[in-house]
Amino acid sequence: VGLGVILDVVYNHLGPEGNNLKAFSADYFSHQYHSEWGESLNFDEENAAPVRAFVLANVRYWLAEFHLDGLRFDATQQLFDASPEPILSAAAREARVAAGDRGIFLVAENEPLLDLSARLTQRPRVQHR
């Protein structure tokens, strides 16, 4: 038909109000990072495994169960993760596996647009003499 569905997924924050996850474990949140919207999720500190597992399962779920055409990752500059495999890389890997033979779109919002981390997704420029 020519119409694709891309879901906006937000793994960088839960919101400043109504977040009750600390009642289950304070380790779900980072002890060193803070986002623009409140507490950051724990992707790279001690006991980060449950948070990482949840996010990766969520990525697989949307693509495998609903056959979405892609995911748009909200405000990736607020995903703080110094792991050997950062959560965004792991999510991209899992998304491709969940999609199987289907082509999918993975879009990473990054603000400000001139942020130097955006260079990681650009092709190297060829210098002409």
Language-model features: locations:
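Active-site-proximal helices and loops of the catalytic beta/alpha 8
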Residues: 28, 35, 75-129
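Active-site-proximal loop/turn and secondary-structure-junction residues that shape catalytic pockets
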Residues: 11-15, 47, 77-79, 112
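Short, well-ordered coil/turn segments that N-cap beta-strands
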Residues: 2-3, 8, 67-69, 100-104
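Conserved, mostly hydrophobic/aromatic
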Residues: 8, 62, 73, 106
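Glycine- and acidic
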Residues: 41, 71-77
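Aromatic- and acidic-residue-enriched carbohydrate-binding clefts of CAZyme catalytic domains
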Residues: 1, 15-68
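Generic structural signal for well-ordered alpha-helices
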Residues: 7, 59, 63, 85-92
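Aromatic/hydrophobic pocket-lining residues that form the small-molecule binding cavity
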Residues: 11, 52-55, 84, 88
